[in-house]
Design a protein with these regions (language model features):
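Short, low-complexity N-terminal intrinsically disordered segments enriched in polar/charged residues
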Residues: 22-46, 175-190
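Generic helix N-cap/helix-start motif at coil->alpha-helix transitions
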Residues: 29-31, 111-113, 124-126, 182-191, ...
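Long, contiguous interaction/recruitment modules in multidomain scaffold/adaptor proteins
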Residues: 68-195, 199-217, 238-241, 246
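TPR-repeat structural position
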Residues: 203-204, 237-238, 271, 306, ...
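A conserved position within tetratricopeptide repeats
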Residues: 211-215, 245-249, 282-283, 317-318, ...
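Alpha-helical adaptor scaffolds
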Residues: 225-233, 245, 255-272, 276-319, ...
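Terminal, low-structured helical/coil segments at or just beyond the last alpha-helical repeat
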Residues: 356-386
Length: 386
C-alpha cells in the first residue's frame, strides 16, 4: 500500500510539474515572438513599435541620473524624446551602402526580466551587437529598459547622458562625466574644451587638445573611447594605432571595446589580434555567434591557417545553421584546404537552403572558388544534381 501511495504521489507530481514547465517555455516563446516583431519592424524601416516598447520613465531616469545636464538641454530632450531616441539609435550604426538589418540571435526571460542579443549587419560584413535589457508591463508587453551597444562601446542611456552633458559642458557636468573626481581646475578646463570639440565635431581641435592632456587624464575610459572613435576615421595612421594601444593598456580584454578593436585590426592586417578580440566579444555577449565565427575563419585564411579557418567555419555553421555567411565561410575554407568533398556539403546547403546556383560559371567568378570548377569531385557532384 505504501508503494502504491508513493507511485500515486509521483504521478501527481509529474502531472503538476510538466504542464508548468511547458507553459513557462510557451510564455518565453510568445515573448520572443513579440520581440522578434519589434526588430522586424525596424528592418521594415518602422521605428514606432521599438519606440513604444522603450520604457520612457525608466530610460529618462537612467539618462538624467547618469550625469549633470543643464535644465534647458534636459527640457529640450524631454519634449522631443521619441524623435531624439530614434535619431540617436540610427546614428549609432556604422555607415552602410545597404539597408542595415537586425537578427535576434539570443533571447532569455525569467520572471519579469529578460535579455536579448540582436546582431545588426551593415555592408562590407560590418556588424553591430546590442544586448537589450527587457521587462514587462502590466499587460505582459515587452518593455526595453536599456541596451549595451558594442559598436559604440557604451550603454545607450550613458551615451545619451554624455551627449546631453557635452551640449553645455559646464565645470560640474564635465567633472561628473569623469571616473575620478579629484582633478584640479586646469584639468577640468582641458576636458571641457575637449568636450566642446566633440560637440562641434571638430576632430582636428579634439586631437590638438587631447595631445596636450595631462598624463593622469589618459586613464579616463570616456576620453579614450572618444579618442578611438575620432582616430578610427584614419585607421592607417599612427594616431589610430596609439588610440588602440592606450585602450588595450588601460582596459585589457574588455569586451565592450572588442568590436571596434576588431575593425581596426582587420583594416590594418593584424588578423591574430582580430581573432583574439572576436573571442573576447563572444565571451562578453555570452553566446556562440555564426557571424563572429565566419569573421574568425576569414582572419585565419588571411594568415594561411586553413585548419583553423575550417574549424572556425564549422563552429559558425553549428552555432547558426540558418546563417548563409557561415556556409560561404565553410565553402571557402574547405576549398582552400583542398577538402573538395567537404566543400560540396557547403555547396549543397547554399543551393538547397539559400537558393544559389553553384554552377561552374558562378564559381569561376569567385577568385577563391574558381579552382573548384575544374575539379573532378565538384564535377561529379554537379552531375549528380542534374
Amino acid at each position: 500500500m505504501k508503494l502504491i501511495r508513493q507511485l500515486a504521489a509521483a504521478v501527481m507530481f509529474t502531472a503538476l510539474v510538466i504542464p508548468v514547465s511547458a507553459t513557462a517555455q510557451t510564455d518565453v516563446d510568445a515573448l520572443r515572438k513579440q520581440f522578434n516583431g519589434i526588430i522586424e519592424d525596424l528592418n521594415d524601416n518602422s521605428f514606432e513599435r521599438f519606440n513604444r516598447a522603450i520604457s520612457k520613465k525608466d530610460m529618462t531616469a537612467r539618462i538624467y541620473g547618469a550625469s549633470v545636464i543643464e535644465p534647458e538641454v534636459k527640457s529640450a530632450f524631454s519634449k522631443e524624446f521619441s524623435s531624439s531616441i530614434q535619431g540617436l539609435f540610427t546614428a549609432s550604426f556604422p555607415k552602410s551602402k545597404k539597408e542595415i538589418l537586425g537578427t535576434v540571435v539570443d533571447f532569455r526571460f525569467k520572471g519579469n526580466e529578460g535579455r536579448a542579443v540582436v546582431r545588426y549587419v551593415s555592408s562590407g560584413y560590418r556588424y553591430s551587437y546590442h544586448v537589450y535589457e527587457l521587462g514587462l508591463d502590466s499587460k505582459r508587453r515587452i518593455q526595453i529598459a536599456d541596451w549595451i551597444d558594442y559598436y559604440r562601446s557604451s550603454r545607450f542611456s550613458e551615451k545619451v547622458a554624455q551627449d546631453l552633458a557635452m551640449a553645455m559642458p559646464g565645470k560640474q557636468a564635465t567633472r561628473n562625466l569623469l571616473r575620478r573626481q579629484s582633478y584640479n581646475e586646469g584639468q577640468i578646463f582641458q576636458v571641457g574644451e575637449l568636450f566642446k570639440a566633440v560637440r562641434d565635431n571638430q576632430p582636428e581641435r579634439f586631437f590638438q587638445i587631447f595631445d596636450g592632456l595631462d598624463e593622469v587624464l589618459l586613464k579616463e575610459p570616456l576620453l579614450l573611447r572618444i579618442n578611438l572613435q575620432f582616430a578610427m576615421a584614419f585607421p592607417q595612421s599612427p594616431r589610430a594605432g596609439n588610440a588602440v594601444r592606450l585602450l588595450v593598456e588601460s582596459f585589457p580584454n574588455e569586451a565592450l571595446y572588442s568590436l571596434q578593436m576588431t575593425e581596426y585590426y582587420i583594416q590594418t592586417g593584424q588578423f591574430q589580434e582580430a581573432i583574439e578580440a572576436l573571442t573576447t566579444l563572444e565571451a562578453g555577449l555570452g553566446i556562440r555567434d555564426g557571424a563572429i565565427g565566419s569573421l574568425k575563419s576569414s582572419a585565419a585564411l588571411a594568415m594561411g591557417r586553413t585548419e583553423d579557418a575550417v574549424a572556425y567555419a564549422l563552429q559558425a555553421t553549428v552555432a547558426e545553421p540558418t546563417l548563409q555567411v557561415s556556409w560561404w565561410s565553410l565553402l571557402r575554407a574547405r576549398t582552400r584546404a583542398e577538402d573538395y568533398s567537404g566543400a560540396t556539403e557547403a555547396l549543397a546547403r547554399l543551393e538547397d537552403d539559400f537558393g544559389h546556383s553553384m554552377d561552374p560559371a558562378t564559381l569561376r567568378r569567385d577568385r577563391f572558388l574558381r579552382v573548384l570548377a575544374s575539379n573532378p569531385v565538384y564535377q561529379d557532384w554537379r552531375a549528380s544534381r542534374q
